[in-house]
Amino acid sequence: MKILFAASEIYPLIKTGGLADVAGALPVALRKKGHDVKLIMPAYQGILEKVAPIQKSINLGNPFGVGDLLLLETHIPENDTPIWLLQCQALYEREDGPYVDKNGIDFEDNHIRFAALSWATATLALHGHLMNWQADILHLNDWQTGFAAAYLESWKVEHIPVVTTVHNLRYNGSFDMNQFSAMHLSPELLNMHGMEFYGRFSGLKAGLVYANAVTTVSPTYAKEILTPEYGDGLDGALRAMQDRLVGILNGVDYNQWSPEKDTLIPHNYDIDTLSQKQANKLALLQENGLSEDLNQPVFGVVSRLTEQKGLDLVLQVMPALLEKGARLVVLGSGDKYLESQYLELQNNYPNQVSVRIGYFEDYSHRLQAGIDALLIPSRFEPCGLTQLYALKYGTLPIVRQTGGLADTVFEDGERANGFVFKEASAKALQAAMERSIECFHDTNRWQEKQKNAMCYDYSWDAVTDQWISLYESLIN
């Protein structure tokens, strides 16, 4: 099959969250199975320095009046995956991140920036002769590429199957109606059964309603988003299409995330050399100037610092546990108030708490290898990848039972690989953390859970066949 895979971020070129990890790994896994996959993504500032020399370019014109759209053909050196980069200086050459300015405010022209990406994607899918390659299927990801389904609908194209994957329903890419005329889409699409969304228009809703299949990144999340509690205003539309909605769990690239061969951690280890995890723990504590007592647990957070992630709850419970000797290592950024609260916690417990604001890939590996337990108390979690990384590193996740966390972390029975709580409350989180501390001091029980965790296979190889079956069902 020839699969055109569109995303707004792709690891290792650019990453703000789990979408980049998926977009960087699933196409590689599909190519290993013999399928012809090509990626498309904007040429953000600095991206051209990270790819192979440009092999071919084509000018798609200036449909949005902001400058010519150039499609550049190249590949990602790390895995040889072919990629088309959409270049437009006015839209993508910015020093800030891909979506927001340095103050964390959405770019005012995001509707045009990602309409252009979507338009180019749809054009490429429809007119394969432009690059001498005709896609059999188009795979879109989140709202930034969802508009591509609307362009194909607007152009009355029916012969190209479209799959849209929702990585997080909360980011619906909705815009004011007075911006719609700039999109060059048919006004016929602006209705409650189309891309209209509570008096606005939405890129995500376009991607949902005009797709042949909709996927989410875990089976439990696929069920949750049919309810008002988790549906973020789209549950009605999703219930109407639930016959073409499926949850496929995200995978992990174990070439990147495996303690046996991870070049970013001080001491490699596997299930038979778990004592080396203690060496990583000591190295992490020393790196951060924290108390080096190996007989007390170290909890970790690698996350966006937001209420969605439940990280306000961690702030409520942590002081009581720190008083008993626990440590906390945090890596993340997000809500400015939460950032300041975590930094204040660090100031109050300088020998027990380390906080780094931002995201640093190499440090996240050292953190996963060095902590004992990873905190993920999310109010909702479409899939979650950090708990999958943690499991492979023998780091036990402490999670709220929601979305992909419910599909991958279990507290009891033969599958036990972490700690689980149900209610999104500080009390429930603290009880789970106290259970983990009790288990930590029972070395045999703790190591049994660690070994269970490390045996789970959440590799992309294990889930790729589900994607192939879905694609084939749509093409046939």
From Swiss-Prot:
Coiled-coil segments on the chain, per record: none
Broad EC category: transferase
InterPro entries xref list: Glyco_trans_1, GS/SS, Starch_synth_cat_dom
Reaction(s) the record says it catalyses: [(1->4)-alpha-D-glucosyl](n) + ADP-alpha-D-glucose = [(1->4)-alpha-D-glucosyl](n+1) + ADP + H(+)
GO molecular function: alpha-1,4-glucan glucosyltransferase (ADP-glucose donor) activity; alpha-1,4-glucan glucosyltransferase (UDP-glucose donor) activity
One Pfam family recorded for the sequence: Glyco_transf_5
Pathway as given in its UniProt record: Glycan biosynthesis; glycogen biosynthesis
SUPFAM superfamilies named in the record: UDP-Glycosyltransferase/glycogen phosphorylase
Residues noted as binding ADP-alpha-D-glucose in the record, renumbered to the chain: 15
GO biological process terms on file: glycogen biosynthetic process
EC number: 2.4.1.21
NCBIfam families: glgA, PRK00654.1-2
Protein's name according to its UniProt entry: Glycogen synthase
